[in-house]
């Protein structure tokens, strides 16, 4: 087989190759064996119709489309490997003639990654981020620690405030009728969390245990349940219990409970300050790198195939789904709680997907133009670093990475990191 790749406009190209006559004849035989199993022929058991009778009744040409599908599946992988291309999607399959005993010429139009035309990517400017840590920052971190160690104490007489955890019943009414999914008993909600429809939690503030109230809200226009979208409804709520956070005192004992490596509150404050400084420096570095990649991407020209953007949106949806599932929330529940839809989410993700795909192509072009390489030793060193970070043996980690391309994928990530290093080394603060 001789495969020939011819680049066309944009991200399209045509792969031409010829499958030998004997391969097509074999595919026709396979197609007959597949089709005959579905035929009931008088005088023969199902699937036992003779080939000669089939050809007489239907014509051998009736097998050609199935045979072509079989031949394509048997030959396309070898042709792609021989041509050296990495197709993203199939656009069209063209075969001019099909005749038994003759070779078959395939002309396959594929979508491939487009080349990025780089603009300015050296001498870019970035916004320097302040990394100093103040006493107020340390105090805020201590307050967060207090809240993590807080106990929920029942408020016997007090009214609901923001931050309180409330246990209550609710029933949603559209006019005189209750609607599905709008009713629950002994539901627990942190007021101010924003988990309910806008306006709901705010109207609970000030209520006391045992009290009831009708809460008027309007579902968002883009709400996933079309029958409720944009509709005003009433939730009848009954408050059962209100719990407020009781914060622990800031003492040396508190400090030791929060961090067994310190012996006093002052030591804890020092450790917090050091950690915040390191975190802010890392965040500042990440912000600078993101800003430079964004600028280099903006300066470049890339004709993005729609299929690449769609694939990226699909990846983003899967990532988001896995993230919320790890928090015990499925996608349908998320849409119900936030009043949005999957279609709206995908539309919102599309612009970000375009930027992500374009940025990858720009970095890939910088890797090519700068002739950036990653050695086997560098890849192994990165694998070892990941092993220590995730506390997983390096050989086990390499096995886990194998389905995603193993060390080759790791090398690609390191090439991108080095490409960003080129941007950083040639950039300056505004």
Swiss-Prot record:
Keyword Cytoplasm: yes
InterPro entries: PPIase_dom_sf (IPR046357), PPIase_FKBP_dom (IPR001179), Trig_fac (IPR005215), Trigger_fac_C (IPR008880), Trigger_fac_C_sf (IPR037041), Trigger_fac_ribosome-bd_bac (IPR008881), Trigger_fac_ribosome-bd_sf (IPR036611), Trigger_fact/SurA_dom_sf (IPR027304)
Pfam families assigned: FKBP_C, Trigger_C, Trigger_N
Domain called PPIase FKBP-type: residue spans: 163-248
The EC number(s) this enzyme carries: 5.2.1.8
NCBIfam families assigned to the protein according to its UniProt record, in alphabetical order: tig
Protein name per UniProt: Trigger factor
Species, as recorded: Exiguobacterium sibiricum (strain DSM 17290 / CCUG 55495 / CIP 109462 / JCM 13490 / 255-15)
Lineage summary: Bacteria, Bacillati, Bacillota, Bacilli, Bacillales
